[in-house]
C-alpha cells in the first residue's frame, strides 16, 4: 500500500463485508442486501395492491398471495441470472479457470443486466402461469426494485469493490484494498442514489401523482430507461473494469464502456414498453383527466 497521506476521506474502519461469523456460517452485508431488497419489494407491492384506484380499470392485476408466491421465483431468478451474467459476460476466463468461485455469490460479483434478464424470464413465466397481464407484472416489480438496487450498491461500497476513478474532489474516498491507495470517487454511492433512491422517488411520483399503473408498462418502462441513464452517467466516474477483449479493441480510448453498451438494449426495451403503454386503447377512458 502507498504510505503517502491520502488527501481525502479515509474509508470507515468499522465497515467490514462480514456482519457476523458463527462457526462455518458467515453472514455478509452483500447477501443481506439482496434479502432486504427483495423483502422490501414484496412489502411495497402488497401496499400498492391494496389501492385499486391506482390500477388499470381500478382492478389490481393480482392478489397479495400471488405476489408472495413470486418472492421465491424472484430471489432465484435474480441470483442465478445475476451470477451467470457476471460469469459469462464480464469475466468468463477467470471463472472457467476457477470453477469453485462461480457459486461464491457472497464474495460479490453480480451482473445487474444478467439479474434483469433472469427476473424478466421469471415474470413472464409466472404471469402466464397465473393469467396475469405481463406488463402489469413488470410494473409491480419495477416499482420497488430501485430500493434493492440502492441497498446493494451500498454493499458494494462496504465490500470495497467497483470504486471510482481517482479524483481531487473533497468527498473522495481512499479504499484500503486499492493497491495505489488513491483518493477516488465513491461511485458505488453515486449509483446507490441515482439508480436506487432517486429513481424510486421518480417512480413513486408517477405512480401516485400521475396514476402511471393505469397505462400498463409505463412504470417498468420508466424504471428501465431511468436505470440505463443513471448507469451510463455513473460509468463516467467508475474506475475502468476489465472489458472483454473484443470490446476493448473496438472502443479503445473512446470513453465508451461495456456497462454503457449493455445499457443501450435497456433503453430500447424501456422505450418499447412506453410506446406499447400509450398505444393501449383500453386505457383511454381510464386515465385521470386534468381539471381546468
Curated annotation (Swiss-Prot):
Coiled coil: none annotated. One of its GO terms (cellular component) is plasma membrane. It is found in: Cell inner membrane. This is Phosphatidylglycerol--prolipoprotein diacylglyceryl transferase. It is a multi-pass membrane protein. Its EC number is 2.5.1.145. It comes from Bartonella tribocorum (strain CIP 105476 / IBS 506). The chain crosses the membrane at residues 25-45, 70-90, 102-122, 138-158, 193-213, 217-237, 255-275. Catalyzes the transfer of the diacylglyceryl group from phosphatidylglycerol to the sulfhydryl group of the N-terminal cysteine of a prolipoprotein, the first step in the formation of mature lipoproteins. The keyword Transferase applies.
Amino acid at each position: 500500500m502507498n504510505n503517502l497521506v491520502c488527501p481525502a476521506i479515509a474509508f470507515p474502519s468499522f465497515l467490514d463485508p462480514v456482519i457476523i461469523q458463527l462457526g462455518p456460517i458467515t453472514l455478509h452485508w452483500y447477501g443481506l442486501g439482496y434479502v432486504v431488497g427483495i423483502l422490501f419489494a414484496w412489502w411495497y407491492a402488497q401496499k400498492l395492491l391494496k389501492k385499486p384506484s391506482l390500477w388499470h380499470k381500478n382492478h389490481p392485476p393480482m392478489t397479495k398471495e400471488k405476489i408472495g408466491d413470486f418472492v421465491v421465483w424472484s430471489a432465484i431468478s435474480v441470483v442465478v441470472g445475476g451470477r451467470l451474467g457476471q460469469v459469462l459476460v464480464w469475466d468468463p476466463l477467470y471463472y472457467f479457470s476457477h470453477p469453485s468461485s462461480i457459486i461464491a455469490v457472497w464474495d460479490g460479483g453480480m451482473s445487474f443486466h444478467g439479474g434483469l434478464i433472469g427476473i424478466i424470464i421469471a415474470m413472464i413465466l409466472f404471469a402466464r402461469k397465473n393469467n396475469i397481464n405481463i406488463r402489469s407484472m413488470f410494473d409491480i416489480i419495477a416499482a420497488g426494485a430501485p430500493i434493492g438496487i440502492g441497498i446493494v450498491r451500498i454493499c458494494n461500497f462496504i465490500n470495497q469493490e467497483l470504486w471510482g476513478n481517482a479524483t481531487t474532489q473533497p468527498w473522495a474516498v481512499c479504499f484500503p484494498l486499492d493497491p495505489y491507495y488513491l483518493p477516488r470517487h465513491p461511485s458505488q454511492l453515486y449509483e446507490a442514489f441515482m439508480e436506487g433512491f432517486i429513481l424510486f422517488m421518480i417512480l413513486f411520483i408517477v405512480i401516485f401523482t400521475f396514476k402511471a399503473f393505469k397505462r400498463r408498462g409505463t412504470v417498468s418502462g420508466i424504471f428501465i430507461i431511468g436505470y440505463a441513464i443513471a448507469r451510463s452517467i455513473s460509468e463516467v466516474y467508475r474506475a475502468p473494469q476489465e472489458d472483454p477483449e473484443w470490446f476493448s479493441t473496438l472502443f479503445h480510448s473512446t470513453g465508451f464502456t461495456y456497462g454503457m453498451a449493455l445499457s443501450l438494449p435497456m433503453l430500447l426495451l424501456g422505450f418499447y414498453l412506453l410506446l406499447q403503454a400509450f398505444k393501449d386503447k383500453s386505457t383511454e377512458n381510464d386515465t385521470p383527466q386534468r381539471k381546468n
